[in-house]
Swiss-Prot record:
This is Thymidylate kinase. PANTHER family: THYMIDYLATE KINASE (PTHR10344:SF1). Homodimer. One of its GO terms (molecular function) is ATP binding. Belongs to the thymidylate kinase family.
Length: 222
């Protein structure tokens, strides 16, 4: 008779550990895209783990193309309808995000639900209404909030190229982030430093936490 009993620990070694959902948030031009790429490279090349980067809004989808036209000042739209479009853009990615995570791929994301809520609430839309649209989406495991004054962000290259890149509006967004969204589970990163200093801090946090997060279940936004 063939012995099919597995040795203790063998099943754990062969089981695929889930991927991590890592998110970068912050006002415009604080360096999110740069740090997304840096951490993606670190996870892939140093930790040797499968990794994919995403960005919201995803402007490649039909919904994303409508959003892009708005952001480029090509169209106008009711603010509540626009918020629902942004939220729908995240919902249409839900299944692919969960599939990647369950198959062991780490996802590093530039903006997500919190950004959508902050921007819409900064226009005066009810915060709770904005957030309700996001409930049920996959919840990030690690959130890096890149902190920089709105004034300093305006000094960076290409600032002002899109509809929302206005100083007073960015100040409102920052206030909503820090008063209603950022909590003790977010990693607040001082973005007024060199790219390498920021990258090293973020990579160090990931390295110290990813193994324990792999053993947890994927949560939902509530």
């Amino acid at each position: 008779m063939i012995n099919t009993k597995k040795e203790e620990g063998e099943e754990e070694k062969t089981m695929i550990k889930r991927g991590l959902f890592i998110l970068f948030e912050g006002v415009d031009r604080v360096g999110k895209s740069t740090q997304v790429q840096s951490l993606t490279n670190h996870i892939s090349n140093v930790q040797k783990l499968p990794t994919k980067s995403l960005r919201f809004p995803d402007r490649t989808t039909p919904i994303g193309q409508i959003i892009n036209q708005y952001l480029q000042n090509a169209t106008n739209m009711d603010d509540r309808a626009l918020h629902l479009l942004f939220s729908s853009n995240r919902w249409e990615a839900r299944d692919s995000i969960l599939e990647l995570l369950n198959n062991g791929t780490n996802i590093v994301v530039d903006r997500y639900s919190y950004s959508g809520v902050a921007y819409s609430a900064a226009k005066g839309i009810d915060f709770d209404w904005c957030y309700a649209c996001e409930k049920g989406l996959p919840k990030p495991d690690l959130i890096f909030y890149l902190s920089m004054s709105s004034e300093d962000a305006t000094k960076r290259g290409e600032y002002g190229g899109e509809r929302y890149e206005k100083l007073e509006f960015q100040k409102k967004i920052k206030q909503i982030y820090e008063e209603k969204l950022v909590d003790d589970q977010w990693k607040i990163i001082n973005a007024n430093r060199s790219i390498d200093e920021i990258s090293n801090e973020i990579s160090s946090i990931f390295d110290s936490e990813f193994k324990k997060i792999q053993l947890t279940s994927i949560a939902k936004l509530e």
